[in-house]
């Protein structure tokens, strides 16, 4: 069995797996909330520069120069796409007190 920890399976040769009687399974969809929360975690890491602070502490450097972030409250956040993940991200950002601007992507049938 090949168990993929992702939604896509384009990196597996399905015909070859079938010929060798190997089952292929995948995650059909991730939790939109989990993905949105991870995006917020990355946003906070970049904003508060915790990745830089972590590296400095490991180097025994405890200076605060260049580590100042800013409050998200009152800031404008732009979100492209309002699928399940985009909606979950918007709800979290609204909870931070941000103004949220949305762009809805539409597929036009021409």
Residue ranges and their predicted role:
Residues 65-110:
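Rossmann-like dinucleotide/phosphate-binding beta-alpha-beta segment
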Residues 1-25:
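An N-terminal-biased, well-structured beta-alpha scaffold segment characteristic
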Residues 6-9, 29-32, 106-107:
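Short, acidic/turn-prone active-site loops that include or flank metal/cofactor-
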Residues 20, 28-76, 88-91:
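Phosphate-binding beta-alpha-beta segment of Rossmann-like dinucleotide-binding domains, i.e.
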Residues 11-16, 51-62, 97-99, 103-108:
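Mobile beta-alpha loop/short-helix "lid" or hinge segments that flank ligand
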Residues 6, 24-26, 46-48, 101-103:
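Short, surface-exposed linear patches
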């Amino acid at each position: 069995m090949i168990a993929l920890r992702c939604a896509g399976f384009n990196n597996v040769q399905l015909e070859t797996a079938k010929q060798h009687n190997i089952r292929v399974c995948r995650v059909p969809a991730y939790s939109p909330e989990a993905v949105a929360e991870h995006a917020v975690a990355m946003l906070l890491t970049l904003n508060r520069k915790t990745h830089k602070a972590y590296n400095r502490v490991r180097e025994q450097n405890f200076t605060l120069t260049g580590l100042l972030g800013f409050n998200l409250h009152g800031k404008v956040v732009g979100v492209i796409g309002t699928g399940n993940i985009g909606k979950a991200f918007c709800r979290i950002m609204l909870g931070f007190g941000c103004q949220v601007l949305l762009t809805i992507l539409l597929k036009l049938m021409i």
